[in-house]
Amino acid sequence: MGIRVLKGGMLTTVQDLGRTGYQSQGFGVAGVMDVRSFKIANLLLDNPENEAVLEFTLMGPTLQFTSETIIAVTGGDFLPHVNGKPVSMYTAIYMHKGDVLEFKGSRTGSRGYIAFSSYLDIPVVMGSRSTNLKCSLGGFKGRRLKDGDYIGFRIKRRYLPYFLSRTLDLDEFDQEEVTLRLVMGPQDRAFTKAGRETFLNEEYVVTSDFDRMG
């Protein structure tokens, strides 16, 4: 009763709202990068607000379901498909035993979220199920998901009232261009004026060496 990871994607981890209260001991908060999409995913399924989800970056995973459940996919539009057929985002999706969820690309955004009505069977570590990759802590064995991993569910599929109306208009969340804002810190004086101009105006390229920190 759970999900088998056929393909782990580029960076897929278990996340919730994070692990607070331990930063003074050297443990980062971790947690989801897009809190709004995370909360909407759980809201669509009547899940607890902080129920753990799968967060993926740039390339979604391929998952096979070993039992029935209901899921919701939010975040950027990664063109989700079930058994080769396209399915809607921001809506409750019924998954049968044996169904395969995969993603065909990235139309918008860089991160996506998959919530499960059966709850992922992930232990709570220091008050959270979030994965902290730097510390190899929490989540699924403290790491990103890999091909062949298996995650069980904690409960059987729950009945959801008004199932067909559990959907949101994706257009509300479409953004063709995103503005990144920053606040200069106390160390900015350590750089020359030309250096600051370079930082603010040059183009940046995301490589395969990126992680959740940058």
Residue ranges and their predicted role:
Residues 1-214:
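Conserved "landmark" site that anchors the functional core of diverse proteins
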